[in-house]
Structures are given as structure tokens and as C-alpha cells.
Amino acid sequence: MARRCEVTGRGTVSGNNVSHSHIKTRRTWKVNLIKKRIFLEDENRWVTIRLSTRALRTLRKKGIKAAIKDNGGSLGVLAPKKYAGITKQALKKA
């Protein structure tokens, strides 16, 4: 799974560290991601999504569906997952 926010689409970016003597070295900046359970009142169920802490602030302000639409995302993030709640061991046995 890529390190990408499911609400805003933000991911890892790369650039340079620049020292005092202007020597440039490559580095990456990773998104501060968390897993968050959100209750969908109109569907009466919980959804677990992976989002950045910045997106979490937006969710508290606007609500989940408005935040996804404003960022050009798909509401498919909220769709029930095919194997939600099933462990890897149970999938191997099946």
C-alpha cells in the first residue's frame, strides 16, 4: 500500500536538503498518516480510512463526504472493502 492519504491524495515528495555551504543532498518528506475509524451516519456503519493529520482537521470542519468531494477524490474510498475484518490467516485457509 502506498503512503498516500485517501482523502487528499497527498503522498511522499522529494527534494534537497541544503546545507550552510549550499551542498545539496536528496531527501524525502513523508506524509503523517494515521488510520482512523469514521462513522457514516446515513449508512449506519464504520469505515476505516488512511488519512493525513492535515486531512483529519478538514474532516472535523467539513465532514467526510464534503472533504473528499472538495479534494477531487472518489467516494469509493468509503465503499465496503471486500475482505474487511478478515485476517490474513483466514484468507490463506480459504
From Swiss-Prot:
The keyword Transmembrane does not apply. One of its GO terms (biological process) is translation. One of its GO terms (cellular component) is ribonucleoprotein complex. It holds the Pfam family Ribosomal_L28. One of its GO terms (molecular function) is structural constituent of ribosome. The lineage of its organism: Bacteria, Pseudomonadati, Spirochaetota, Spirochaetia, Leptospirales. The gene is rpmB. This is Large ribosomal subunit protein bL28. Residues 1-21 are annotated as: Disordered. Residues 11-20 have a biased composition (Polar residues). The keyword Transcription does not apply. It comes from the Bacteria. Keywords: Ribonucleoprotein, Ribosomal protein. It comes from Leptospira borgpetersenii serovar Hardjo-bovis (strain JB197). Belongs to the bacterial ribosomal protein bL28 family.
